[in-house]
Amino acid sequence: MSRVGRLPIAVPAGITVTVTPDNVVTVKGPKGELVKTMHKDINIAVENNEVIVTRPSDQKAHRALHGLTRALINNMVIGVNEGYQKTLELVGVGYRAQLQGKKLVMNLGYSHPVEIEPIDGITFETPAATKVIVKGIDKEKVGAAAADIRKWRLPEPYKGKGIKFENEVIRRKEGKTGKK
């Protein structure tokens, strides 16, 4: 039995989980609604404010899908209840971010400002000029949006300049030693 998959998912008050016969899972909560189609071989049941995920056999593919499906549904339940957020820091001289309406505009040392439109269900916040918070209810979209922002200036190992996640540790390298 999958160590992740065998655990039931507790459904908090105020959240409804529905599963159609073709494994379309809908989770509604105070922050919104998420719909995801799960693999047809995995059995999903909602009983007594718990979601129980079971697999039909012990084939390797079914074992893998068992834990994955349970984790995806759990992420949906947490997302509509609490939401997800990722914090990015801009490190470098002149690197800064600001909001123009819903659009994120960043100065990253290019000849032009970088403008990023939020995808559906994602919002940006800039509590400081060098800090960007990506918020949303879908964990996958929040991570993808944060990764899209980060790829504009990946942190470099010599000075540590670039866009990094809040608790990310950049492995630093020593520069060349000059001749004497």
UniProtKB/Swiss-Prot annotation:
Gene Ontology biological-process entries: cytoplasmic translation
Family: Belongs to the universal ribosomal protein uL6 family.
PANTHER family (alphabetical): 60S/50S RIBOSOMAL PROTEIN L6/L9, LARGE RIBOSOMAL SUBUNIT PROTEIN UL6M
Cysteine pairings via disulfide bonds: none
GO molecular function list: rRNA binding; structural constituent of ribosome
Lineage, broadest ranks: Bacteria, Bacillati, Bacillota, Clostridia, Eubacteriales
Function as written in the Swiss-Prot or TrEMBL entry: This protein binds to the 23S rRNA, and is important in its secondary structure. It is located near the subunit interface in the base of the L7/L12 stalk, and near the tRNA binding site of the peptidyltransferase center.
InterPro entries, per database record: Ribosomal_uL6-like, Ribosomal_uL6-like_a/b-dom_sf, Ribosomal_uL6_a/b-dom, Ribosomal_uL6_bac-type, Ribosomal_uL6_CS
NCBIfam families: L6_bact
Pfam families: Ribosomal_L6
Subunit-structure text: Part of the 50S ribosomal subunit.
Keyword Transport: no
Organism per entry: Clostridium botulinum (strain Alaska E43 / Type E3)
Protein known as: Large ribosomal subunit protein uL6
Keywords of this entry: Ribonucleoprotein, Ribosomal protein, RNA-binding, rRNA-binding
GO cellular component, one term: cytosolic large ribosomal subunit
HAMAP family attached to this UniProt entry: Ribosomal_uL6_B (MF_01365_B)
Signal peptide: none
